[in-house]
Amino acid sequence: MRINPTTSSPVVSTLEEKNLGRIAQIIGPVLDVVFPPGKMPNIYNALVVKGRDTVGQQINVTCEVQQLLGNNRVRAVAMSATDGLMRGMEVIDTGAPLSVPVGGATLGRIFNVLGEPVDNLGPVDTRTTSPIHRSAPAFIQLDTKLSIFETGIKVVDLLAPYRRGGKIGLFGGAGVGKTVLIMELINNIAKAHGGVSVFGGVGERTREGNDLYMEMKESGVINEKNIAESKVALVYGQMNEPPGARMRVGLTALTMAEYFRDVNEQDVLLFIDNIFRFVQAGSEVSALLGRMPSAVGYQPTLSTEMGSLQERITSTKEGSITSIQAVYVPADDLTDPAPATTFAHLDATTVLSRVLAAKGIYPAVDPLDSTSTMLQPRIVGEEHYETAQRVKQTSQRYKELQDIIAILGLDELSEEDRLTVARARKIERFLSQPFFVAEVFTGSPGKYVGLAETIRGFQLILSGELDGLPEQAFYLVGNIDEATAKAMNLEVESKLNK
């Protein structure tokens, strides 16, 4: 791993200081810069524009070289607003790509695309930095073993297990619990795997970024009293930022995650919210650079850009980066080039259902819509596979019977179907689980359920051994022993009430 001992905003050596250019043209966030003959910067080099605008305000804009136009001109995309820039202003070639701080100093802090802290908590230790443009790990470095990434969340581990070093798509509308699920995963990886997380907010609402930060502080994922004990680093490039920043903020977050994997040899969770905005920003930049648009107006380099990000997210022999990416589907059209290109890279999908959230079943993961390439007998074992398939079959049969129940009632069903419905309702409730990060809101302690316990619990429900227990005993409990204990308590309470 290459580590450049530079600071977060590119520092210029005296030798490179002579490599100065001048702004020739400004088109919104795109700058054309003229350099002396033979002094052309490389593609992806960071350029810095420093000076004062017409009212004397200090300007410090970092850009990234995207095209070499000929005639000693380069075209660069700005990473921040270009307000106040003028033709003829001096531009410094830093001689290297953007570099951002990496390592333990990033935990508990919020950064922008340039790796500058934006949380007003003072400077960050920038002795260890890394360039945001790196090649994906070589084939020989990859860890090709297929292994399950245990999350401690029953519905995920049983029905749509995550792959260590894999990529998971998180689908769900507003208010169905995406943020809480993300925070629980951050908490569980820190406790069970001793790992850390990096959250990349790509082109989403600033309010949502602020809410997430506040909720993380409240739930202890970010430790305010001792920042070093925090479990997550946050990198934001929100909706109000120029397209250059939104296009590169995912790479900044990924670079921080790669350091934890390659140098600290840890398991890392990388969250990207939202991967669609990364594509959208790339589309804007592509149009600004004058490229001919491709299908549905997207950039012609769509799959290349997506591949260069996704291929760096993988397991190596040192550690793993497991990525969970929120996917916005424009107009609910899964054939749109942006989500369609994303699907090609995903190992699992976790679909959150508004119907389940309305019933109060959290996490509101849809057991029938969520999928995983890992759910195969040769990977998870026959016992796990059989249990998962039977849970899905029972849930599917209940779904088919719901219309009949709504019209005719339960009494009109056959004995076998009534038994199926009773078990399916127990399964539905047993798929709910109290979260550690929700303790502050619910008052009930969180539960981490191991995979073996999860399988045992569902086998007992499917076998009919627990048919005599009331279904409310299975709601918001950890393992199956807690459900039987809760059933006994309910029985005692009902006797006392009589």
Curated annotation (Swiss-Prot):
Bilayer topology: Peripheral membrane protein
CDD domains, sorted: ATP-synt_F1_beta_C, ATP-synt_F1_beta_N, F1-ATPase_beta_CD
Cystine crosslinks: none
Molecular function, one GO term: proton-transporting ATP synthase activity, rotational mechanism
InterPro entries the record matches: AAA+_ATPase (IPR003593), ATP-synt_VA_C (IPR055190), ATP_synth_F1_bsu (IPR005722), ATPase_a/bsu_AS (IPR020003), ATPase_alpha/beta_chains (IPR050053), ATPase_F1/V1/A1_a/bsu_N (IPR004100), ATPase_F1/V1/A1_a/bsu_N_sf (IPR036121), ATPase_F1/V1/A1_a/bsu_nucl-bd (IPR000194)
Catalytic activity: ATP + H2O + 4 H(+)(in) = ADP + phosphate + 5 H(+)(out)
Subcellular location: Plastid, Chloroplast thylakoid membrane
EC number: 7.1.2.2
Residues that coordinate or bind ATP: G172, G173, A174, G175, V176, G177, K178, T179
Assigned GO CC terms: chloroplast thylakoid membrane; mitochondrion; proton-transporting ATP synthase complex
Pfam family, one: ATP-synt_ab
UniProt-listed Gene3D superfamilies: 2.40.10.170, Bovine Mitochondrial F1-atpase, Atp Synthase Beta Chain, Chain D, domain 3, P-loop containing nucleotide triphosphate hydrolases
Record function comment: Produces ATP from ADP in the presence of a proton gradient across the membrane. The catalytic sites are hosted primarily by the beta subunits.
The protein's assembly and partners: F-type ATPases have 2 components, CF(1) - the catalytic core - and CF(0) - the membrane proton channel. CF(1) has five subunits: alpha(3), beta(3), gamma(1), delta(1), epsilon(1). CF(0) has four main subunits: a(1), b(1), b'(1) and c(9-12).
HAMAP family: ATP_synth_beta_bact (MF_01347)
Name the UniProt record assigns to this protein: ATP synthase subunit beta, chloroplastic
Organism from which the protein derives: Hyophorbe lagenicaulis
